[in-house]
Amino acid sequence: MSNLKQLRTRIKSVKSTQKITKAMQLVSASKMTKIKTQIANSNFYIEAINKMMSNIFSMTLCELSIEEQKFFNTMPSKANLLIVMTSERGLCGMFNYSIIKQVKNDIKELANKGEQIKLIIIGKKGYEVLKRQYANYIDSYFEFPKSHYANLILQLKEKIMYAVENLEISNCIIYFNKFKNAMTQILTKQKILPIEKHRDYSVVENYHFEYEGKNLISNLINLYLYAKINYALLQNIVSEEGARMTAMDSATNNANDLISKLVLKLNRSRQTIITTELIEIIAGAEAV
């Protein structure tokens, strides 16, 4: 009987866990849908900024100041700034593994070349792993906010601009997961600084630029950095929720399979007990 009680207790426990994983799956699905809408709304904006930044500075009317040139030229013998986006929470499968592995490989490669490295880490999971080996490289760590990401984006943008203006870094790379679907996230390594200058005449023809004041270019640089960080952040968040939804769906299905096996085991145990009792009753009756 004690065995039956243990099986019933375990079935109850697994069912309780299954309810939690199912709820987490639904929450992640809801969050993923909302963020996908935000990404869709921002796609035109990021595309327009990219095109403008890659063309406007090749036009003769736009002359870069010394301060502005720092965003377009590689500063020799300066640090490589690596911005690593991971998750704040777990239960999202292998979501963080690929990014952390890539960052470790790149750090090793840069260190072997004798180059300087600065790390900015977003997300508790990435920070907990990377601080064990690379604490001396970590410049900043930011927690992922549950909502309202604008403040984090502004903080990151200001840190990047300060580092460039003070000649602390030679380039800046963002590591994040790009969303393909709920089951697939693409590891993305995007170089955002120095800003590449090239001219696409087919694009320039669609724009009419008017130079208004000396702050035009610096304002565009601000918009460019904000857009790049915002894009990476949203992609990483929706990828995390997709990975978590998939992981929780798998956990829910596994729990269902385990419940079926435990119920079968429970029924067999009960059947064995009943059969044993019947045999004892029959044996007793025959003895009489």
From Swiss-Prot:
InterPro entries reported for this sequence: ATP_synth_F1_ATPase_gsu, ATP_synth_F1_gsu, ATP_synth_F1_gsu_CS
Listed CDD domains: F1-ATPase_gamma
Gene3D superfamilies, per database record: 3.40.1380.10, ATP synthase, gamma subunit, helix hairpin domain
UniProt keyword list: ATP synthesis, Cell inner membrane, Cell membrane, CF(1), Hydrogen ion transport, Ion transport, Membrane, Transport
Tagged with keyword Hydrolase: no
Gene Ontology MF term list: ATP binding; proton-transporting ATP synthase activity, rotational mechanism
GO cellular component annotations of the record: plasma membrane; proton-transporting ATP synthase complex
Location in or out of the cell: Cell inner membrane
HAMAP family referenced in this protein's UniProt entry, alphabetically: ATP_synth_gamma_bact
Biological function: Produces ATP from ADP in the presence of a proton gradient across the membrane. The gamma chain is believed to be important in regulating ATPase activity and the flow of protons through the CF(0) complex.
Protein name: ATP synthase gamma chain
Lineage of the species this protein comes from: Bacteria, Pseudomonadati, Pseudomonadota, Alphaproteobacteria, Rickettsiales
